[in-house]
Amino acid sequence: MTSKLEQLKQYTTVVADTGDFDAIARLKPVDATTNPSLLLKAAALPRYAEHLRRATAGSGGDAGLACDRFAVAVGKDILGVIPGRISTEVDARLSFDSEATLARAHRLVELYEEQGVGRERVLIKIASTWEGIRAAEILEREGIQTNLTLLFSFAQAAACADAGVFLISPFVGRIYDWYRKSENRDYVGAEDPGVRSVSRIYRYYKANGYKTVVMGASFRNLGQIEQLAGCDRLTISPDLLQQLADSQGELPRLLLPGDGEPRQVLDESAFRWQMNEDAMATEKLAEGIRLFARDQEKLEYQLATRH
């Protein structure tokens, strides 16, 4: 019998959630995603020392530019061993500023193009705030496709679909974490709140004819991945990808299009109200932005203090 990883690839596009070039080359995903936390880990790997040096040398003392140059250098390397696309993230500190997000997205695309990488192989990752979604809407019209991340609520998913974004990344594991702590209980299988959230979004998109890709993210265990077999894409850490590759047994498609809710079009006030009413989404979005911003600052400091 083929491994569970190979079976999953029959239903779902598998994406590697890492900046580890060697792991990507070994596990052979279609696409790859990075974020400030993963880039901070990548910066500690010996193979990226030269990228760090060049990023710093070419940035004129601008630590933010150095981070973008490093992210693009890592992304270009990864694109050499995958057939698909790399997701590169805008500075999380810009999550509530549409204009600044647009400017940073344009810079990332320009840096990739300077390296001979066309925009068709890049997704710009942006936090799923109201301001981030509005910036993504403009980028999509410009032919720059986006990956809306830190997505925890149905309101965020509905707004992203209405804006015509290319792809969303709902965070399964972080939703699970919040409910496990809040309710003081464990969840397995289809009752997992993170699994239920992604399943609801997937069926809503399919029922209403949205083309936005649903890419489940942030997994804590194989059970969550198995429940979402059939999702458009799943971005998975190297450790869990390896566990799937080492696992035998049948992996059926469990997520199928089905009855979805009627289409919702949310204006800003409705979006903000629905977010306000969802304590989990409000807390996890804020926490996620803070964590990514913290790791961005750590990476900037590391680049600024290189000798």
From Swiss-Prot:
The keyword Transmembrane helix does not apply. Its EC number is 2.2.1.2. The active site is at residue 125. It catalyses: D-sedoheptulose 7-phosphate + D-glyceraldehyde 3-phosphate = D-erythrose 4-phosphate + beta-D-fructose 6-phosphate. Its main location: cytoplasm. Homodimer. This is Transaldolase. It comes from Pseudomonas paraeruginosa (strain DSM 24068 / PA7) (Pseudomonas aeruginosa (strain PA7)).
